[in-house]
């Protein structure tokens, strides 16, 4: 199993980068005993101005073949943290790769979005993609702690 966050744009050094690194490091340490691999970050950038279609092509190349495709989109399902953890556990138990895709300023091209196994939303509001990365990294770590029975998550 591989876990990938494929995102449009480059993350500069700053508080967001530190938070993402911290949560993904925590996940890597806690997830090892649960059979969860470290998360890799694949950043893509369309420098030719091709828009969502060009971004989708770059994102598709970053996604492992056959991976469960999870897109972050304001039209997606709003899962609880335990529901998200259960999805991750299911992919782990199937030994299936999973790719979380975060689009750019204009979102994710419908051609890629419509082929997703799951679309999730962090609410009906639109979030800056750098904050979505932080929120996703935290939820991946939180899912790991839920699966481990760690008290980090409280109901």
UniProtKB/Swiss-Prot annotation:
Any one GO CC term of this protein is: cytoplasm
Q: Where in the cell is it found?
A: Cytoplasm
Q: Which reaction does it catalyse?
A: pseudouridine(1915) in 23S rRNA + S-adenosyl-L-methionine = N(3)-methylpseudouridine(1915) in 23S rRNA + S-adenosyl-L-homocysteine + H(+)
- SUPFAM superfamilies, A to Z: alpha/beta knot
Q: Give one GO term, molecular function aspect.
A: rRNA (pseudouridine-N3-)-methyltransferase activity
Q: What class of enzyme is it?
A: transferase
What InterPro entries does this protein map onto? Alpha/beta_knot_MTases, RlmH-like, tRNA_m1G_MTases_N
Family affiliation: Belongs to the RNA methyltransferase RlmH family.
UniProt-recorded name of the protein: Ribosomal RNA large subunit methyltransferase H
């Amino acid at each position: 199993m591989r876990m990938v966050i494929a995102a449009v744009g480059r993350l500069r050094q700053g508080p967001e980068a530190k938070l993402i690194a911290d949560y993904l490091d925590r996940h890597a340490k806690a997830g090892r005993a649960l059979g969860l691999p470290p998360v890799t970050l694949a950043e893509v950038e369309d420098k030719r101005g091709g828009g969502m279609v060009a971004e989708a092509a770059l994102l598709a190349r970053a996604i492992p073949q056959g991976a469960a495709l999870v897109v972050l989109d304001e039209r997606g399902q709003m899962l609880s943290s335990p529901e998200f953890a259960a999805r991750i556990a299911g992919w782990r138990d199937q030994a299936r790769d999973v790719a979380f895709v975060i689009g750019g300023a204009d979102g994710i091209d419908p051609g890629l979005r419509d082929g997703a196994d799951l679309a999730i939303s962090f609410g009906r509001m639109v979030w800056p993609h750098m904050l979505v990365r932080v929120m996703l990294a935290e939820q991946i770590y939180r899912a790991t702690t839920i699966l481990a029975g760690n008290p980090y998550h409280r109901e």
